[in-house]
Amino acid sequence: MNTRFLDACWGKPVDTVPVWLMRQAGRYLPDYMRVRSKCTFLELCKTPELATEVTVQPVDILGVDAAILFSDILTPIEPMGMELDFTPGPVFAKPIRTMADVEALKIPKMETDVPYVLDAVKLLRKELATKVPLIGFGGAPFTLACYMVEGKGSKDFAALKKMMYADPEVYAALMDKITTMDMEYLNAQIKAGAQAIQIFDTWGGMLSPADYERYVLPYTQRLINGLDRTNIPVIHFVKGAGTMLEIVKQAGGDVMGLDWHVNLGKARDILGDMAVQGNLDPTVLFAPNEIIEREVKRVLDENAGRPGLIFNLGHGILPTVPPEKAIFMVDCVHRLSRK
């Protein structure tokens, strides 16, 4: 098996910088669209054989150094008692607004409530045995709460922030319950065979540093501390957190995910020995090849040869990116960083 990705997570020497892409199993790949055309998004998430097929596609097509389980961060929320649909974005029929709503949420039994996730992990470990490691993942408690309270995607998640400020007891009870669920969900993935875990906090960066520290940090910290992490690296990605890396670092984990709004070298100075993942602007993949190569080189140069770099985009690959551009980017990373 290619262990570059895991070695880099632990800060060990590698022959070339490992690379994978957030949303690498996705709509930009014709092979993915072929599978997706036959089922709904939720059916794809809930059918282990199909989830396995699309998870492996980018490993074979792009030559990336890790696979990430095909699923959705909201998958474990449905069995908590919230009706979920995708139209095409996530929509909850009845958002959480009151303490009674929070009390009605149940903690799922992972083996019986989301068996398809764990079955996909087990299938993937067999499928990827001679290829690359498998990353399991989940949403951070705050980002999950954003969707559960708002009921759908939003630019500002005003309903959640209103709860945070005006109903702190309800907010705390909700975050506490989500954190407990999240811990059990990610530990179930680890038990099923996930070799690394990524925690996505897509909306954590919309808060001020003081609010992040007060309303988010304690829950993410508790989540990470509660994971069965023996030899399992944890990647913590908070989009938009470049101005508060010192605070986010306190949550724990082994690798800090970075978006493109921060200079990777300066981030490394702040984070010390902690490994990092990132941080190319996803829209660079629409550029001519020479620009892609220039930008890959810039990120590598900012790292200045320090161990513990996993190359990635600063957020998910966009659906309209030509696959050959992603292939070229992966090749650039390997070629330009080869020892």
Swiss-Prot record:
Its EC number is 4.1.1.37. SUPFAM superfamilies: UROD/MetE-like (SSF51726). Substrate binds at residues 23-27, 72, 147, 202, 315. The keyword Ribonucleoprotein does not apply. It catalyses: uroporphyrinogen III + 4 H(+) = coproporphyrinogen III + 4 CO2. Its main location: cytoplasm. Signal peptide: none annotated. One of its GO terms (cellular component) is cytosol. It is found in: Cytoplasm. GO terms for biological process: protoporphyrinogen IX biosynthetic process from glutamate. The record marks 72 as: Transition state stabilizer. One of its GO terms (molecular function) is uroporphyrinogen decarboxylase activity. Keywords: Cytoplasm, Decarboxylase, Lyase, Porphyrin biosynthesis. Pathway: Porphyrin-containing compound metabolism; protoporphyrin-IX biosynthesis; coproporphyrinogen-III from 5-aminolevulinate: step 4/4. InterPro entries: UROD/MetE-like_sf, Uroporphyrinogen_deCO2ase_HemE, Uroporphyrinogen_deCOase. Homodimer. Belongs to the uroporphyrinogen decarboxylase family. Catalyzes the decarboxylation of four acetate groups of uroporphyrinogen-III to yield coproporphyrinogen-III. PANTHER family: METHYLTETRAHYDROFOLATE:HOMOCYSTEINE METHYLTRANSFERASE RELATED, UROPORPHYRINOGEN DECARBOXYLASE. This is Uroporphyrinogen decarboxylase. It comes from Citrifermentans bemidjiense (strain ATCC BAA-1014 / DSM 16622 / JCM 12645 / Bem) (Geobacter bemidjiensis).
